[in-house]
Amino acid sequence: MIFYNSLSGKKEEFKPIEPNKIKMYVCGITVYDDCHIGHARTNIAFDVINRYFKYRGFDVTFVRNITDIDDKIIKRANENGETTDKLVERTIKSMHDAFDKLNILRPTKEPRATQTIPEMIAMIETLVEKGFAYQGTNGDVFYRVAKFADYGKLSKQNLEALEQGSRVDVVEEKENPMDFVLWKMAKEGEPAWDSPWGAGRPGWHIECSAMSKKLLGDTFDIHAGGSDLRFPHHENEIAQSEACNECTFANYWLHSGMVKVNAEKMSKSLNNFFTINEVIEEYHPEVIRYFLASTVYRSEINYSKENLDNARASVERLFNALRDIEPVEVNLPDDASEYEEKFIKAMDNDFNTPEALAVLFSLAKEINTLKTVNKYKASGYAFLLRKLCDVLGILFTDIEEYFKQGDGIDVSEIEKLIAERTQAKKDKNYARADEIRNDLQNQGIILEDSATGTTWKKG
């Protein structure tokens, strides 16, 4: 298995620290607002990778943190006139609900920053003792970037150039403009914890260093996150952790590509910013997940109606292949292993989901060909298709339920119209019955009458 390591800037063969075990840390969200489509992209990317590791037989400890104390959280809570605790709990529930809808597995462990304060303080104390941190004139504790010789090794940036670029941002309480905060002194009305430097709260970067150390150890296999976190967040994590622990922080670094909207950067100022729940109002979660998983994880992905409509068509092709066929493992044909080997070859090469999906569509084509001539063999291929779809986390909805739910379709309204049509037929009002059938057909809903009643599906 090889994948791109952001630290080395090239593809490398993956060698876990412990055989058959993987320890992986993914930077989670700062819980001050509902998750947006960019969060979905990052978390689906690493969910697919997590699922693939498990499929390949690894025992995965997958840690995804929650940043539950931050300037943004405090600001939003004040704007809402509520406590930070109330905002945090509501936002975490919203996150879980959205991720569950997208079939994102819950992490093995989901630490909160506020539950790891003692470990953060201990790390900062060690950094101060070793000369990597100091207390500024305003009481805040800062990391002394110039003392860490390898600063910039992840983002491939030169410290001297960074320092020159930040001269305009000179802050008197710091020795160097590049120094970043480890501990912030308390402000009136803000959450605070006691520390050797006075009451305050941690800086963002030390939170992840402490949480990963607590749950995965000083050195672990994989650290991952969105490409926007590579600098300064991940660079600062390395500086803190390696100075404190005197060993490699993470052996492999994975970064997911950003979401663009109609080829533009997604941002609230451009009014092209969408929450997960807003997108689900227009597209089924199956479609959203397929769309976000269909591009190689480290590439940018373009969010557009055209691309989502194409994803919907692809999802329906896969579902249609599994329609009217019962997946049966014992019926696996002898040549089924060839499909699985191609799938593994694709995913073993930097988690190449487009190539993996091409294998699934080849399987779907085979199933469709065999349905009417060899249902036994078709059911074996259907089992394999289901199995491999599960590795990517797609086709998680019941087939008939998917076609009933559709996109933006009001199921209760359809059922109501079917009941009205049934009554119209009983009343011999065939004109009204035909009108209802035609109206639904124009919406892409096909009615099927039988002796037991009327069923419907998307056309």
UniProtKB/Swiss-Prot annotation:
Catalytic activity: tRNA(Cys) + L-cysteine + ATP = L-cysteinyl-tRNA(Cys) + AMP + diphosphate
Biological-process GO terms, alphabetical: cysteinyl-tRNA aminoacylation
E.C. number(s) listed in UniProt: 6.1.1.16
Keywords: Aminoacyl-tRNA synthetase, ATP-binding, Cytoplasm, Ligase, Metal-binding, Nucleotide-binding, Protein biosynthesis, Zinc
InterPro entries assigned to the protein according to its UniProt record, in alphabetical order: Cys-tRNA-ligase, Cys-tRNA-synt_Ia_DALR, Cys-tRNA/MSH_ligase, CysS_C, Rossmann-like_a/b/a_fold, tRNA-synt_1_cat_dom, tRNAsynth_Ia_anticodon-bd
Ligand binding (Zn(2+)): C27, C208, H233, E237
Location of the protein in the cell: Cytoplasm
SMART domains (alphabetical): DALR_2
Enzyme class of the recorded protein, top EC level: ligase
Span(s) of short sequence motif 'KMSKS' region: 265-269
Pfam family, one: DALR_2
Predominant location: cytoplasm
Cofactor(s), names only, from the UniProt record: Zn(2+)
GO CC terms of this entry: cytosol
Binding sites annotated in the UniProt record for ATP: K268
Cofactor, free-text remark: Binds 1 zinc ion per subunit.
UniProt similarity note: Belongs to the class-I aminoacyl-tRNA synthetase family.
Subunit structure: Monomer.
NCBIfam families documented for this protein: cysS
Record protein name field: Cysteine--tRNA ligase
Native organism: Francisella philomiragia subsp. philomiragia (strain ATCC 25017 / CCUG 19701 / FSC 153 / O#319-036)
Gene, per the UniProt record: cysS
